[in-house]
Amino acid sequence: MMQKYQDSSLSPEERASDLLARMNLDEKFGQIQCYNAIDSFLGKSVEKQNPYGVGQVCILIATMLDDAGSVAGLITRLQKQIMESGKHHIPAIFHIETLTGVMVTAATSFPCGLGQASTWDPEQQQKMAACIARQGRAMGISHALAPVFDICRDPRFGRMGETYGEDPTLAAAMGTAYVKGLQDKHRMSACSKHFLGFMAGQGGIHTAQAVVSPRELREVYAKPFQAAITDGKLDSVMNSYAAIDGQVPAGSKAILRDLLRGEMGFNGVTVSDYSAVEQLESIYHLAESPADAGRLALEAGMDQELPTLAAYNDELKENIRSGVVQESLLNEAVLRILTMKFRLGLFENPFPAENVQAEITPADTALSRKIAQESMILLKNDGVLPLAKSVKKVAVIGWHADSVRALFGGYSALAMKENTLGVKMSMAGIQADADSPAAENAVQKTYPGSEVVMENPGVEPLARRCYPDAYSMLGALRLAAPHTEFLYAQGYPYAGNEESGYDAALQIAKDADLVICTLGGHYGWNASCTTGEGIDAMHIGLPVCQERFLEKLESLHKPVVGVHFDGHPISSDTADRVCNAILEAWAPGAQGGEAIAALLTGKANPCGKLPCTVARHEGQIPVYYNHPTNTCYSMTGGTPKNAYIDGAHTPRYCFGHGLSYTKYEYDTLRLEKDAIQADGVLKGQLHVRNAGNKAGTEIVQFYVHDVAASMVRPVKELVGFAKVNLQPGEEKTVCLSLPMSQLAFLDADMRWKVEHGKVELMVGASSEDIRGKAEFMIVGDAYPDGKNRSFVADTKIM
């Protein structure tokens, strides 16, 4: 007879409740554990480690496999072993990183998080996530460790490139779109991370304590998570490593139960960041043993420990059996895990699709190229771009220029795969084996003047083998402009102060009509990288070797274009002075070379906008556009001038900045009404016209400023935006609908409040390039449910 949990016509919740009631303690405990698939290659079978079944499988080892069929084969083998180990045949969830695509080289690659944010295109983000879900589930992967919802205001932090930048509204819009695209049709479950305040770590140091007030934690850092929970029906959340106010999220009831589940209404699955539960004992000394750390985490509401069995161990299981730890804690965790499995359809379809070799379609590649192209930001241009037909000879200089590897950043398949070449990796929660054969053969020589290990000479051949259709920037330029001669010299590396290549590079620059210099560091996961997870920096400028070269190049009086690759924005006085144009390329993925070539040659028009404020110097940090009144670069009192004694308060480039090859004109911002009830919706509109002779895309940005409030409020806040495609001379109408609940803030009693009073609405091409303003009055007060307030204003283009 069919049991209720076997009936697919019932809801996931009903099926999970029925199955839970049939499971014994051993079976239930297996569901909160994770098996690391790499152990299957080390003689540690899943049947031995998890004889009663297992909740999740870490499939990061799939990155080392060359094709989708091999990944699917591994998952099929493990899934069969897991399902055969228990009498209820419960399938496991297989998880992998998906920030820039499914983290295998057989899947489509996309730009890093900052690049995605720079498109300001939630609709495109949803399409990207749907592509990831289709490719991942075809291989048998059902849990995606993305998107990254951390708000980052510190470019010293090596993981900035994973984020959507500094603004909670932009992050909410982009991340919620990602969640919707990924979870559509229940192909995969999204896991948003890192809850909470992770990249507010002191000193820009990975896993360092985050000093954030309870108010800011909720208004800023929790907002993207709340939007995804409310509007995206988010399936899972991963904790932050960073301690907040003396509490570590992995073992904090206040953070996981009271805030996440209580205040924010999250009812999905919580999973630990790698090794975070055992670190409650080993690093933070909050527990007396691994099992005690497991108890703290389970009591706090941590459902599953990743990536392997450590604190959710046999000792903890026996403590539950004896009643020392309440079994009800285990039951509630397992109920959520089973519900997610039923929602994913794993009981009906536990295995990969057959014949997954051709999952990357031409449409997937075209989408990747389009996102890469629209992620790039023209920061500066005095007219040298696009390249004129009169430019016949171009000198191309820099390590990145002829490197396919340079197109990829952290949390990409290639960044993980290059760790097989023997440079110590930096991924948190993963033990690096210094005695491994790869490490023994590693090249440990560093770039002169730095502690960065020289790139293994095998990396670039590996990159070209993994992505045979990818072009370096130089290769793509030669294809895009066949009648232009492109001369190449490396000139300088990506770290240190080496100058031995200067002479050859300066010689080709002398002979050229224009010079393109690639700038920046090496974004990835190991000791040969300059930014990435666990790879933080004191300085935010270019490496000395690049700064000095630009100074020497300046004496030639040649037009110079700088193209910057990195996981944080370019910040250089020298580059600003020497370069006639600067293109921020981030880490654009496999299609990045072609995207850059299209932009430089004018076959495409840049439309990316900064998702972060760019500091002039690390001494300014934190510098961000939505700072509180009378703070940062909007000081109005307490200082004789709005500047440091040795520099300006103002940023190098402002949030939302980005140039185009055409010009856009904005007409008057008009409001339907100038008085709105506190529970009402403000409606407004304006016309935007392409006043140039080239088709382009403008990102129209809406900001608000509370003229007078009971709490200190930001000088301005992004509330919505619209991406407008315009032909030369074309005009379109942008309509805004702004629910007043989006203007709610926490009052003195920590209640969400929409407060009566005057508010200024602004529209502009950036946070500083404001093109129109209008004032309105909020009539009365309202106290909306914080879970159900508006997060991003609706815009329509007519």
What kind of feature is each model-predicted range?
Residues 769-785:
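Short beta-strand elements
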